[in-house]
Every structure is written in C-alpha cells, then in structure tokens.
C-alpha cells in the first residue's frame, strides 16, 4: 500500500500483474495496457516495470522464439540501453530543477519578508547543469506564463507546457505532442518517466558516479589513480536478484572511491568520483539531440496576440526579457494594427494596463487622500509587507488595500480556495514584477503612445483604468502619469469638449438664421 517501506535487505515484490486472453497475442496486449496505465513510484528505489515493458515489445518475445537464457543475454549485452523520449525527459528535468530552485527562492523571499524587507531574485530564468548517461547539459529554463516554459539547450529553443492530471502524474506538451509525465526528485537525482519510460537524470556534479538504484556493491575493480576509458567497469552492483555493473560514462582518472564493497547503497548514492580528461565529459558521442522537439513555428510566435501575451507575462513577473520586448515594440505595434480589429487590440491593451496599475498600487510608499478612513495612515507598501509577514491577518488590514490585493492576485488565478503554495508563488511574482518595473515602464509608454495617436472608441472601463493609472503613478512614474493624462484627454475629454463646442456653434448658427428671417424691428430685438 502507499506509504509502506520496502526492506533493503531483500528484493520485495511490489505487485504481480497477470493478464489473460483468448489468445497469447490478446493476453500480451492486455498486459502491455495494464503496465502502461500503472504508476509505481518507489522513493529512493526503482522497479523493473519499464524493463518488462521493453521485453514485451521485443520482436523475439512477440514471435515466441526466446529461450531461458534470453533475458540474461540481453542484460550482459547491455540491451535496451537506448531509451526513447530522452530529449523530452531532459526538458522535464530542467523544468523540475527550475521549480525546485524557485521553491528555494520563495523560501528566501518569505524569510526576508518576515524580517521586514522582502527580497527577490530579479534574474530571468535559471541555468542548472544536468547529466544524463555521461553527457552534460546546461539548459536555461524560463517560466514564461502559468504552466508554460521555454528551455534553451545546445542552441535549441523548446517551448513546453505542463498540466497536472493526478497525483504525481502530469502531462507535458513539447514539439506538438502531449505525453504522460511522472517526475520525482530524490537523492540528487531526477526520476523522469515519459509515457512509462524511465530516465534518471542527475545534476552535473563534476564526475560523481552514483548508484542507479538501491543495491549491494559486490565489487570495485578499480583503484584511486587508475585511468579508465568510456565504458570500462567501475563497480559491480546487485539489485533485484540480478547483478549488473556501473560503467564509466567518459574517459578519466579515478579520483576517489566513495563506496565500499559488500555494502548496501541507495538510489543516487555516490560510488566513485571520476576526474574527466579535458573536454571528454562534454564530447559524448551519445549526447541527446533536441532538434525533434524544437520550437519551429516562428510565424505563430510572432503573431500580435502572442507578443502582447508576452508583455502581460512580463508585467506579471514571469521570465520574459524586457530588453527583447522593448526592442521589438515598433514591429509589434505595426503587426497588431494589421492583424487585430481595433476593439480586440484595445481589449488586450486594457488588460495589460490593468495588470500594471494593480501591481504598482500595492507598492505606494506614502498614504494618499484615498486613505482618509485609515486612522493609522500607513502606505499600501507597508500593508503589503505586514500581509507578507502573516497572510492570516487580513481582517486587520484596510478594506481598500485588501481589494487591491485580491484584484492583483486574481491575475494569477488566486482566490479564497487557492492553496498556500499557489498564493505564495503569486506573491513572489508580484514582488518580482515590482523589482523589474523600471525596465518595463518603456513598454507601458509605447502602448499609451499608440492609444494617444489612435484613440479609437473606448468604453467606461478604459476610463476607469486610465484614472487609476493617473492616480497610482503620480509622483512615482511621472512620464507614465503625464502620458496617461494626455491619453485620457484625447480619448474622452477632447471628443466631449469638441461635441460641446460643435453644439454651441450649431446653436449659434440656428440663432443667426432666425435673425435673418425676422428683420422687422420688434421680433429682431426679442430674438437678440
């Protein structure tokens, strides 16, 4: 059952799956389906589920021409050494490592908030070294929106989407295909299953050779100082009543032997530290190629709505480069004018303005005239810091501030039913956006300038957004404040004043026409 411990002294059966059918082919098909739909996770352990699935897919098994020595022969020959979906697995591991680092960052953020001054890492993305079958990878991972990531590795850019679909199980979409993902980090190693195929991916730790599963070290045929070639045997291990060996993933010199013979080791336990020769650690001929899942639809990515969504993600504190966005604002403006109707373009821009206003409203450093009902006369930033120290004390905060906070959190899908983890992640992104705000002001100015020169027709909602922007940026972002006033005048005030003026002129013309029609003295004097 879930939560049970499996003793390391002997091999314990987790489950036995038996399939029946009217024919051998039907029984095998049912067994394959049962294994494919079964999720087994052993913390600090491993199962032979994938190995059994590989056996069932082997043509020799399908034809029934195997003998009793077939499995042993495969193991000795290193059969099934190549695992499909390794490219997807490395991307998934990079994303999991990114989220682990973000969890640490959010912990630091909360600790600093408890001390009265929250601090965030305003850097964009994370670079975390990974190692898979002897090859090192340094993917740069960025979270570009909720559930969406961009991974750059070996000169290839990959867009990935991850959705939760059950306990421990997720779905990952890369290269236009969606696959089942199971990801678990244990003992410094990522266990990643893609459509049931397991991969163990470690952090690049400079030549540390680790145990692939719980096992007994039955032999170490090398000594410290020995030089080994790629593929040479470094250690013999026994697991699941089967003996195998750990091979050198690259040529090098044995720097240190960590494990000892006849001892039990867990998954990921260090066995040997191998010093690579020169750059051989990165020159593995078996390196994974990522071209098959690379993002290729450049035209779709350049679409106006996609670019505007990137701007929204930037303002929400996700890992979007403001310099790249700022440099392409002219192209975005011209493309949007061609691709979108004025109403749709204004709708998206208004949402971007709302995000900007809601975030800056939480960081005002001085009280305003709107805080007249607040006897303490504290700023919104002080209230935010109080909330970050203890999110359960919302009752002690002014209603106006909590309304601002709830409206801002709603941009991240956070409401009263959201988990603490979801809320913490949103608060971290809010603080990150504010930390980067100086680099984002130019984008807001460009969008406002477009509305100034193409005011079009706008509803009262946009009037409210502009009013809030004018109020919240006063004495803080003077360029935004002044331009927002100009836009408000151009979109709402000037058309109104022009209509009033035109109506006055029309009335004057009407009165003059009446005077011309009544030239006799008594009527003329009464009209005047």
Residue ranges and their predicted role:
Residues 210-227, 250, 256-263:
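Short histidine-centered loop motifs in beta-beta connectors
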């Amino acid at each position: 059952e879930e939560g049970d411990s499996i003793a390391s002294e002997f091999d314990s059966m987790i489950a036995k799956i038996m399939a029946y059918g009217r024919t051998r082919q039907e029984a095998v098909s049912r067994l394959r389906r049962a294994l494919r739909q079964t999720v087994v996770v052993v913390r600090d352990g491993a199962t032979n589920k994938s190995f059994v699935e590989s056996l069932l897919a082997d043509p020799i098994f399908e034809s029934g021409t195997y003998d009793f020595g077939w499995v042993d022969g495969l193991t000795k020959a290193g059969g099934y050494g190549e695992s499909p979906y390794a490219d997807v697995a490395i991307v998934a591991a990079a994303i999991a490592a990114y989220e682990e680092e973000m969890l640490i960052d959010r912990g630091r953020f909360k600790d600093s908030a408890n001390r009265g001054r929250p601090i965030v890492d305003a850097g964009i993305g994370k670079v975390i070294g990974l190692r898979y079958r002897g090859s090192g990878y340094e993917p740069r991972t960025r979270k570009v929106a909720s559930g969406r990531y961009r991974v750059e590795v070996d000169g290839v850019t990959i867009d990935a989407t991850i959705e939760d679909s059950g306990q421990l199980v997720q779905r990952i979409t890369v290269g236009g295909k969606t696959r089942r993902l199971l990801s678990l980090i244990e003992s410094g190693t990522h266990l990643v299953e893609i459509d049931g195929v397991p991969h163990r991916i470690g952090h690049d730790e400079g030549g540390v050779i680790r145990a692939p599963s719980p096992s007994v070290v039955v032999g170490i045929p090398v000594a410290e100082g020995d030089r080994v070639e790629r593929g040479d045997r470094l250690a013999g291990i026994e697991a699941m009543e089967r003996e195998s060996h750990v091979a050198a993933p690259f040529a090098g010199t044995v720097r240190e032997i960590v494990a000892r013979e006849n001892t039990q080791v867990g998954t990921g336990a260090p066995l040997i530290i191998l010093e690579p020769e020169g750059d051989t650690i990165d020159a593995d001929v078996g390196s994974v190629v990522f071209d098959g899942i690379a993002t290729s639809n450049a035209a779709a990515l350049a679409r106006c709505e996609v670019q505007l969504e990137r701007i929204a993600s930037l303002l929400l504190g996700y890992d979007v480069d403001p310099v790249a966005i700022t440099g392409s604002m002219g192209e975005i403006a011209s493309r949007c004018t061609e691709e979108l109707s004025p109403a749709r373009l204004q709708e998206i821009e208004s949402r971007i303005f709302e995000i900007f206003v809601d975030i800056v409203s939480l960081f005002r450093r001085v009280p305003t005239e709107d805080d007249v009902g607040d006897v303490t006369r504290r700023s919104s930033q002080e209230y935010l810091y109080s909330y970050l120290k203890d999110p359960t004390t919302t009752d002690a905060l002014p209603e106006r501030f909590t309304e601002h906070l709830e409206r801002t959190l709603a941009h991240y899908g956070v409401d009263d039913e959201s988990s603490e983890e979801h809320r913490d992640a949103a608060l971290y992104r809010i603080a990150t956006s504010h930390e980067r705000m100086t680099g984002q002001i130019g984008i807001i100015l460009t969008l406002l300038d477009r509305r100034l020169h193409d005011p079009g027709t706008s509803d009262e909602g946009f009037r409210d957004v502009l009013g809030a922007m004018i109020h919240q940026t006063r004495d803080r972002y003077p360029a935004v404040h002044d331009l927002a006033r100009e836009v408000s005048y151009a979109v709402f005030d000037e058309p109104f004043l022009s209509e009033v003026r035109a109506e006055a002129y029309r009335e004057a013309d009407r009165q003059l026409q009446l005077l011309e029609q009544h030239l006799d003295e008594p009527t003329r004097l009464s009209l005047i």
